[in-house]
């Protein structure tokens, strides 16, 4: 573990001590009320004919595996890279609201990030995109609760 990573981990542990156990449980309770089911990978780069892409697993500092895709620029590698983070409650493929319940509780639309990756790779960018913990195919952590950055940086 690098010294920068150790410093960040120490800072996170110190911040966690500042939040009372009671407040922490209140936040967990509120999060459980609005927690939506995990989005799933309903499309991959093959859908739009992207070539040379592959799955990879990114190990995090706390051991939770983050599942990802690396998609090279059309025509081969370039020196440009976009790291694409998805929004909540989505995954690296997007949002499957168009599949109906239980995902259409938020909205019944499809949000297609894979098409955006196609535009980026066609424009000469390599794309690295991954599922946040507790989303898509990445590992579960923190009781399935999203910390909105409190834990995810690890």
Residue positions per predicted region:
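Glycine-rich "HGGG/HGxG" loop immediately N-terminal to the catalytic nucleophile
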Residues: 118-119, 134-146
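N-terminal cap/lid segment of alpha/beta-hydrolase-fold proteins
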Residues: 36-81
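A charged, solvent-exposed segment within the mature domains of Sec-exported extracytoplasmic proteins
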Residues: 130, 135-138, 152-154
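Alpha/beta-hydrolase active-site loop
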Residues: 112-116, 145-154
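N-terminal targeting or regulatory segments adjacent to alpha/beta-hydrolase or S9 domains
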Residues: 1-47
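Short, surface-exposed "cap/lid" segments of acyl-processing enzymes
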Residues: 73-123, 127-129
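Histidine-centered divalent metal-coordination motifs
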Residues: 67, 86, 135
């Amino acid at each position: 573990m690098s010294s920068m990573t150790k410093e960040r981990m120490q800072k996170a542990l110190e911040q966690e001590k500042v939040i009372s156990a009671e407040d922490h449980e209140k936040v967990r309770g509120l999060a459980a009320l609005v927690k939506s089911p995990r989005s799933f990978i309903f499309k991959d780069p093959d859908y739009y004919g992207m070539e040379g892409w592959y799955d990879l697993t990114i190990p995090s500092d706390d051991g939770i595996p983050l599942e990802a895709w690396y998609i090279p620029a059309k025509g081969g590698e370039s020196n440009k890279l976009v790291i694409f983070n998805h929004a909540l409650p989505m995954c690296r493929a997007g949002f499957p609201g168009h599949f109906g319940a239980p995902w259409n509780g938020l909205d019944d639309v499809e949000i297609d990030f894979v098409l955006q990756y196609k535009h980026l790779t066609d424009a000469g960018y390599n794309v690295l995109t991954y599922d946040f913990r507790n989303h898509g195919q990445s590992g579960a952590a923190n009781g399935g609760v999203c910390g909105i950055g409190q834990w995810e940086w690890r």
